[in-house]
């Protein structure tokens, strides 16, 4: 007997075929686009190095929803619960502070062995891993400078941390058969009027060159650098600005990270993708939702998320753009936050794949902007939800909001016991 979902699917196939879209091919393409989930949503960026310490670096996780992960086992269990509710390929993005060791490890001494459990877990769950050095929440970052620090010994500490992190990243790629994207973000900047804006950038330039001096297999490891407009306590000057890192990534041919919350509120990263791709080999995206500032709210299926996805698909950037998420909301159930944000990113990608882009390009090239706008708007009414629901069914995940029941059950059975 044909189910309601199957009936809707068959009708959707016909509707999309009428405008030249093969929905089966769209689903195949969607499975080529993994989304890298960020581990730090699960514990408010606490990590395991000093979980009771303060979060610094001009970033904030606001809220105090009960049940946050307190150790690696709890965090992995929470991630597994979230991933069961998200269809399609996924990766996990780790920060260096999520190492596991029985004894304290200085950040400039981290080694692959400190992340062995993560690798074994990733193998068991068929995941790729990505990585980040953690240049914040540390005594040697307390004055607001790391890789651009004027003190040679402190700057060298952070250089060594980033070099050690690259080796961890390469280990991930070698073990898992998929390259690890390692993103360098630093909080360096000043609160008030800065007289010498050049010297810190000169130091950062030299430091980064030393960091990436060791040649690593690009099949295992990809370097990325990330700019930011400002942070709390660094409102007036950020060393690693957009211009700095665009120049660095272009001249050194590293990947460039574009974070949706790291620009002026009137700027959008969807418009930056096609420009940056002319100069850099690869892009890393941190899809987020800034509310008035880099607040890292949970990603919505909104215009900008859709525009980001559409840029990737329209320009066939599957092999040059790495999609990551970066938000941390401690005011709601953290597992639900992962599920909502990641599903929304995947929905946006699917919608982009269901767009009649070839026809739209023809209209645009012909100068028929009336028809272009009309078709762009009319295609929004096509039965995309039926295609999404079939995709979820094929990946054995809930199609609609019933996933929330699973989260609530997990919260009652597991999270509520954490205190």
UniProtKB/Swiss-Prot annotation:
It holds the Pfam family RhaA. Binds 1 Mn(2+) ion per subunit. Its cofactor is Mn(2+). GO terms for molecular function: L-rhamnose isomerase activity; manganese ion binding. Its EC number is 5.3.1.14. Keywords: Cytoplasm, Isomerase, Manganese, Metal-binding, Rhamnose metabolism. Its main location: cytoplasm. Coiled coil: none annotated. GO terms for cellular component: cytoplasm. The keyword Manganese applies. Mn(2+) binds at residues 262, 294, 296. The keyword Heme does not apply. It comes from the Bacteria. Belongs to the rhamnose isomerase family. HAMAP family: RhaA. This is L-rhamnose isomerase. It comes from Shigella flexneri serotype 5b (strain 8401). The gene is rhaA.
